[in-house]
């Protein structure tokens, strides 16, 4: 049966969405939880469509956006590098997402052709983290205001990061905030660290330029480096992939050294639907396309 009408129903609670799908109240839900994958796959009336997303989750650090930069994390790249070294990305993926997502440390995933292999996902190193804190002239412990969007998965991620960072004396004080409010506060510089996702773009420029260019609209950390700006502009000129990769390699080193954004992982797009719905195919951009779908 061809579909004549599509009804979109906003349901914010993850458990309610899945319950409605199971009961037949819905035919498809987007953004299923990774922890629900086993349950969905075991249900003969449900199907799971997945794709590795083109976006990422990362931790923004306020390094130049207002008065809230006056703290150890915002003032020193060494301290930000210490926080990075304290995070075990693979453990984070296993604990929160049952290993279903993709640990990362750049604005594109390790499966992307523009991923810089010279800068692989780092292993957790507590000794290095403590040494970097010392190099940064910081005496631990110290507190960090950690703004986190409301939601089961972001809050779980934040709690894991909090536990890991505490082992080197970085006390991440989680402040759960409604998503729309958190964006306004981030833009205004009313935070010290902010857990944030980006849906991603097919070209790496869409994951990079507006986040690291001086005074760019999505540069919530307020980072500004003339050398990074120059390379960002240069990266937009050539159409040759090899030339662009060479520029991105230089950019990657500068951006990872500065750590205004700590890239953490790349989510999978998880779409669950009933077996009544046929013809659904998921692409990496995360969009739900209804053309060609039928109900039996």
Predicted regions located by residue number:
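Extracytoplasmic/periplasmic ligand-capture domains
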Residues: 1-96, 112-258, 293-296
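Mature extracytoplasmic/periplasmic domains
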Residues: 98-118, 270-275
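Active-site-proximal polar cores
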Residues: 264
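Short, loop-centered acidic/histidine patches that primarily coordinate divalent metals
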Residues: 267
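Long beta-strand-rich cores associated with HINT superfamily self-processing modules
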Residues: 271-296
């Amino acid at each position: 049966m061809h579909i004549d009408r599509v009804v979109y129903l906003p349901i914010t609670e993850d458990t309610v969405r899945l319950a409605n799908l199971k009961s037949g109240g819905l035919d498809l839900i987007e953004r299923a939880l990774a922890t629900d994958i086993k349950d969905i796959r075991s249900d003969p009336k449900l199907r799971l469509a997945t794709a590795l997303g083109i976006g990422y989750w990362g931790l923004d650090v306020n390094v130049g956006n207002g008065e809230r930069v006056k703290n150890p994390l915002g003032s020193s790249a060494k301290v930000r590098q210490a926080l990075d070294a304290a995070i075990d990305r693979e453990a984070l993926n296993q604990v929160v997402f049952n290993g279903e997502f993709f640990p990362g440390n750049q604005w594109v995933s390790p499966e992307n052709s523009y991923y810089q292999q010279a800068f692989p996902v780092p292993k957790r190193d507590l000794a290095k983290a403590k040494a970097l804190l010392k190099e940064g002239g910081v005496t631990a412990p110290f507190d960090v205001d950690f703004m986190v969007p409301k939601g089961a998965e972001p809050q779980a991620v934040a709690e894991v990061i909090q536990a890991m960072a505490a082992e080197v004396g970085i006390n991440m004080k989680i402040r759960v905030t409604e998503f729309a409010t958190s964006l306004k506060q981030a833009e205004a510089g009313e935070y010290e660290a902010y857990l944030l996702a980006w849906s991603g773009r097919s070209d790496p420029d869409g994951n990079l330029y507006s986040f690291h260019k001086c005074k760019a609209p999505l540069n919530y950390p307020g980072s500004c480096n003339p050398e990074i700006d120059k390379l960002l502009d240069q990266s937009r000129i050539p159409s040759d992939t090899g030339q662009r990769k060479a520029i991105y390699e230089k950019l990657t080193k500068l951006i990872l050294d500065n750590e205004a954004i700590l890239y953490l992982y790349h989510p999978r797009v998880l779409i669950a639907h009933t077996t009544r719905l046929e013809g659904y195919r998921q692409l990496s951009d995360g969009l739900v396309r209804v053309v060609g779908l039928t109900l039996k």
